[in-house]
Each structure stands twice: as C-alpha cells, then as structure tokens.
From Swiss-Prot:
Cellular localization per UniProt: Cytoplasm
Annotated Gene Ontology cellular component terms: cytoplasm
Domain of life, per lineage: Bacteria
Protein's recorded name: Histidine--tRNA ligase
Organism: Salmonella typhi
NCBIfam families the record matches: hisS
Coiled-coil region(s): none
Signal peptide interval: none
Length: 424
C-alpha cells in the first residue's frame, strides 16, 4: 500500500470551515483599506535572493537562518519571500510607480520562513501589508496607525491589543547609539547568552528585544536610544505622538522597541496582545526612508506595516467568536423528488439574481424531507424553502424559519421580498 503524502511541517491546509472565517476577517480588512484609498498590488512569491539580503540585512535572523533559498536550473539564487515590503519596493521601482509619485498600496498572501512551528507561527504564513511611498511627515505614520485601530474596532478586539511606539532615529543616530550600546555590553559579557554575544557585534540593537530575563534586567542600566536621536527624528516623533493624542489612540513609548529588519528608521510601532498566552505581536511596522534608494530607485520616503493573519484569526476566535459565527448558507432549498428538481434549480437561480450576496444552497442527491432538513441544519441555514409538486403547480413555495419553526406559503414572484424581511 502506497504511503500517504502529507503536508510539509509548518505548512497547513485550511479547510472549508476555516476558510469561511478567514474570508470574513479578510473582507473586513480590505473594506477598511479601501475606505482610506489604498490600492492592491499582487507580487511574486519567489524573488531573487539578493533582494532580501540587501533589503533585510545580511546579519539578521531572517537572512542567516530562516529563508527558503534554492538555485534554479540557470544557477540563479532564488528565495521564497519571507516578507512583503522588499518585493513591493522592487515592483514600485521596476514599474516606475515611485518616481515623483505618491502611492498607497496593500498586498496579501503567503510568506515563508524556516522557523520552529508553534501556535500562530508557521513556516508558510499569511501576511497582509500596507506601504505608503512619497510622504515623509508624521501625519501619514499616524494615518497608518489609525487605519489599524479602525481594524481592531471593526473586528471587536480593541480591548485586547495595545500600541507600542518608538523612534529609532536616523542611520547616523543609530550608529552613535550602537557604539555606546556595544561598549556597555562589552563590560557585562558574563550576563549575556551566546545569542546576545553573537549579536553584540553583528546587530547589537537586536539584543534589546532578547527574551532572556537576565539580559532584560541588565538593559535597565544600558544607554537609551532616545538620548541619541537627531533633532529631526525627535520632531517627527513628537508630531506623531501629538496626532495620536488628538485621535484618542492610546500608546506606550517603548525605548527597547526595534524592528528585526535593518531597513527601518525613525518611527517603529507594534500592536501587541496578551490574549493568546504570552505577549505576541499582532501587527508591526515603521518608516523606511532609505530602502527605495538602497534597492536602486531614487530617494523616496516610505512607511508601512505588516500583519500575520494566522495570529489575527486566533485572536478574533479567542476574544470575539460572535464575529465569525457566520452560517455557510442562509437558505436551503428542499425539493420533493426528481420531478421538482428542475423547478427548484430555476427558482434558486432567480433568487440569486434578485438577492445578490445571499448564500443559497439547493439540495442535490435526492433524499426524503427528513434527510434534506438534516442537511439544511448541517449547513447552518436559517431558512428552508420547500418546493413540492403542488407548489410547482400553483407557483408558490413554502418558506420555513428553521429557528422558530414557523412556515408559510408565499408566491414565487414575491418570495425574494419575503426572504429579505426574514433575513434582515
């Protein structure tokens, strides 16, 4: 007997019951993006490896440990995308979208990182990102954060996420801070774990978000990044905080917040939650004014964020399950025998024309009334339409509310209006 082939570890199938939840959440996210005037861009899953090395940084965990990289038949090094910003910038440069233009873009799709699979974190994961090009003021940073806050309200999870902000300044300011931080860490190497000792010289800012409690305690006495900020970055960050205060968006300034990718400057932010066990990041982003030029384009200010959809789905399921309690179908059409099947299918098509968006399923495969009503219940239908020979003859259909059990015969010509009333 042949051995079953299974999905690769950390790469999951999403079955019909799960995809219905995803579609509901994704639809909400896309509607909010549209209300802010953002446009979708669709990008390749595979890119040339140098794109990510140049954008993300050679000495980041993503590039050193986590990328799925391979050579194609021409000997070119290709990589399954580990994040979306680099590909979005590459596309903007390649197609002339960024030259003296303002762009507000979003994308959605699978990303790939070779990490240890755990709840909410997989080797193939799904990400929604938004990127804005051509605007350099703190007002657009604030708008992106306001947009995400509107998502949380729409999903009913506002009370379960909190915003952390920081400014990591300019490249020059970070270089000065990096020197001070390394000098401090060198004096306390006995407290550092092996990972922090390695990062101390390759990417010292990553030591700031070490999960080691001893290292975190040590960092209480470390130099603070905010003390090294340039004047422009201070002014930018103060402007952002003022706008968020005016919008009523609560936040915490976290001086240890740095992002895991090298291209960020000035604003960085994360929305975090404690509702999934240990604290986890739901959405994160920041400003990356140098990346377009770094990848071969003209100097272009830019800011964006990305959100892992697996973790968002888990959060909505945990704290607002009513949001996703949506039936697979609204209406189930029961037909009494093969002789009425044609009339049932004709009626179903007419109702789909008259009621766009309604989820209507027609019974197929026969079965008596008991079996058909059991199928209606299985699919979560609120209403059953019953069509027998007598109803076909006199142009009516029986409408049964499956919650209350009430039923009434309605003329087929007016059944759509009757159903709209029942469905609200």
């Amino acid at each position: 007997m042949a051995k079953n082939i299974q999905a690769i570890r950390g790469m999951n199938d999403y079955l019909p019951g799960e995809t219905a939840i995803w579609q509901r959440i994704e639809g909400t996210l896309k509607n909010v993006l549209g209300s802010y005037g953002y446009s979708e861009i669709r990008l390749p899953i595979v890119e040339q490896t140098p794109l990510f090395k140049r954008a993300i940084g050679e000495v980041t965990d993503v590039v050193e440990k986590e990328m799925y990289t391979f050579e194609d038949r021409n000997g070119d090094s290709l990589t399954l995308r580990p994040e979306g910003t680099a590909g979005c910038v590459r596309a903007g440069i390649e197609h002339g979208l960024l030259y003296n233009q303002e762009q507000r873009l979003w994308y959605i799709g699978p990303m790939f990182r070779h990490e240890r699979p755990q709840k909410g974190r997989y080797r193939q994961f799904h990400q929604l990102g938004a990127e804005v090009f051509g605007l350099q003021g703190p007002d657009i940073d604030a708008e992106l954060i306001m947009l995400t806050a509107r998502w949380w309200r729409a999903l009913g999870i506002s009370e379960h996420v909190s915003l952390e902000l920081n400014s990591i300044g300019s490249l020059e300011a970070r270089a000065n801070y990096r020197d001070a931080l390394v000098a401090f860490l060198e004096q306390h190497q006995e407290t550092l774990d092996e990972d922090c000792k390695r990062r101390m010289y390759t990417n010292p800012l990553r030591v700031l978000d070490s999960k080691n409690p001893d290292v975190q305690a040590l960092l209480n006495d470390a130099p603070v990044l905010g003390d090294y900020l340039d004047d422009d970055s201070r002014e930018h960050f103060a402007g952002l905080c003022k706008l968020l205060d005016a919008a009523g968006i609560a936040y915490t300034v976290n001086q240890r917040l740095v992002r895991g990718l090298d291209y960020y400057n000035r604003t960085v932010f994360e929305w975090v939650t404690n509702s999934l066990g240990s604290q986890g990041t739901v959405c994160a982003g920041g400003r990356y004014d140098g990346l377009v030029e770094q990848l071969g384009g003209r100097a272009t200010p830019a800011v964006g964020f990305a959100m892992g959809l697996e973790r968002l789905v888990l959060l909505v399921q945990a704290v607002n399950p009513e949001f996703i309690a949506s039936p697979v179908v609204d209406i189930y059409l029961v037909a009494a025998g093969a002789q009425t099947q044609s009339a049932a299918m004709t009626l179903a098509e007419r109702l789909r024309d008259e009621m766009p968006g309604v989820k209507l399923m027609t019974n197929h495969g026969g079965g008596n009334f008991k079996k058909q009503f059991a199928r209606a219940d299985k699919w979560g239908a609120r209403i059953a339409l019953v069509l027998g020979e007598s109803e076909v003859a006199d142009g009516t259909v029986v409408v049964k509310d499956l919650r209350s059990g009430e039923q009434t015969a309605v003329a087929q010509d007016s059944v759509a209006a009757h159903l709209r009333t029942l469905l609200g």
